[in-house]
């Protein structure tokens, strides 16, 4: 009985929120492809949320099959003339088409139409993230604190560099910081990376070089996280904690900035993994995302929505990676075609697709292994 209850709790607490969030993000991504493709005159034969066998679906008057499929780990739009869901052209089928039919295929469309259709998916994810953040800022506002130091931890990077209580941080690496959160965000994704902090002290600006210390922290759910710290603390007196509200236009602007922060943070995160500043076991896959979805669900709908915005940016960036089978790989092919004046040969594209598929599968296996290790570790 306990096993059944535990399994039911895992299903409703983790899997269901994960599937709902992921399905929404996949739907928006694929809808971007579909709408721009339709605007460009490219026919779609299938729009699927999930992979594998169809569970339920219908065919619209345009001949597009809309369906939910059995494996809820992605989705696809299959365009007229495509061999598979990765938008690889069916060369044998294309040879039997009329000129009018070929013009309705992805491969037969003008180069700019193909590029616009492929890029529309990731762009839709970025737009969704901006809108989500804008709504959250518009409804809830945010708590901020001034970047003024109340305490410097002993033997910390800040202490070694000469930071003192009362100092106001005005910039890091020449980039202005307006709040203490700006400092935490910038430093947190740069463990072991030399930075220059500009502080204001008695009306004078001082540039203090330091290296954030890599440290492992534990969040409220017990998850271990690696981040950089410099060892400064603020408080109510020094930081002037306060709640601010945003007008609709200000909320949208904050949504754009927040999305930019997520993009920058993601690139720095990847760079830290590649350079070894962060351990590779920090890379998570579907199990860890499902776990995060369930944990956020316990904090309320706003936390789940915020997670959806972050994941939407991640999906957009992932799909823009220059790897064949992903949107970014197709865009690279189109760029090469624009430069050469003709597309890559079918053989070269086939080899690239196979290499890309192996890379994606390898990354998924590695990330899933990290997920399992973190659960049993």
From Swiss-Prot:
Q: Where does Zn(2+) bind?
A: 29, 33
Q: How does it sit in the membrane?
A: Multi-pass membrane protein
Q: What is its main location?
A: membrane
List cellular component terms (GO).
Answer: plasma membrane
SMART domains assigned to the protein according to its UniProt record, in alphabetical order: PDZ (SM00228)
CC cofactor: Zn(2+)
The UniProt keyword set, sorted, is: Cell inner membrane, Cell membrane, Hydrolase, Membrane, Metal-binding, Metalloprotease, Protease, Transmembrane, Transmembrane helix, Zinc
Database matches in InterPro entries: PDZ, PDZ_6, PDZ_sf, Pept_M50_Zn, Peptidase_M50
The record lists the membrane-crossing segments as: 118-140, 299-321, 351-373
Q: Which residues form a coiled coil?
A: none
GO: which molecular function terms? metal ion binding; metalloendopeptidase activity
Q: Where is the active site?
A: 30
- Might you give the EC number(s) for this enzyme? 3.4.24.-
- GO biological process per UniProt: proteolysis
The PDZ domain, residue ranges = 129-202
Entry's localization field = Cell inner membrane
Q: Which family does it belong to?
A: Belongs to the peptidase M50B family.
The protein's name: Putative zinc metalloprotease Atu1380
Tell me which species this is from: Agrobacterium fabrum (strain C58 / ATCC 33970)
């Amino acid at each position: 009985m306990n096993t059944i209850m535990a399994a039911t709790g895992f299903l409703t607490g983790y899997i269901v929120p994960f599937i709902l969030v992921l399905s929404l993000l996949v739907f928006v991504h694929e809808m971007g492809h579909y709408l721009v493709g339709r605007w460009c005159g490219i026919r779609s034969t299938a729009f699927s949320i999930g992979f594998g066998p169809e569970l339920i679906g219908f065919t619209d008057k345009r001949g597009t099959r809309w369906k939910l499929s059995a494996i809820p780990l992605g989705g696809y739009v299959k365009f007229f003339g495509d061999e598979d869901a990765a938008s690889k052209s069916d060369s044998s089928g294309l040879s039997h088409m009329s000129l009018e039919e070929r013009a309705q295929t992805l491969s037969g469309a003008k180069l700019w139409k193909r590029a616009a259709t492929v890029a529309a998916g990731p762009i839709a994810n970025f737009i969704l993230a901006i809108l989500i953040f804008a709504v959250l800022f518009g409804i809830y506002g945010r708590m901020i604190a001034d970047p003024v130091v109340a305490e410097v931890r002993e033997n910390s990077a800040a202490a070694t560099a000469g930071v003192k209580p009362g100092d106001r941080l005005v910039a890091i690496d020449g980039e202005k910081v307006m709040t203490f959160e700006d400092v935490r965000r910038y430093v947190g994704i740069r463990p072991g990376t030399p930075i220059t902090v500009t502080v204001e002290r008695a009306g004078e600006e001082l540039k203090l070089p330091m290296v954030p210390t890599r440290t492992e922290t534990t969040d409220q759910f017990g998850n271990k996280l690696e981040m950089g710290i410099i060892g400064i603390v603020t408080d109510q007196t020094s930081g002037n904690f306060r709640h601010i509200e945003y007008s609709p236009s200000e909320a949208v602007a904050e949504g754009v900035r927040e999305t930019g922060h997520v993009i920058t943070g993601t690139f720095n995160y990847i760079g830290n993994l590649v350079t070894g500043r962060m351990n590779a076991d920090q890379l998570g896959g579907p199990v860890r995302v499902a776990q995060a979805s369930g944990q956020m669900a316990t904090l309320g709908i706003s936390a789940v929505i915020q997670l959806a915005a972050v994941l939407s940016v991640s999906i957009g960036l992932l799909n823009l990676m220059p790897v064949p089978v992903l949107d970014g790989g197709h865009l690279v092919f189109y760029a090469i075609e624009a430069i050469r004046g003709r597309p890559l040969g079918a053989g070269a594209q086939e080899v690239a697709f196979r290499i890309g598929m192996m890379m994606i599968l390898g990354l998924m296996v590695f990330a899933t292994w990290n997920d399992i290790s973190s659960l049993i570790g």
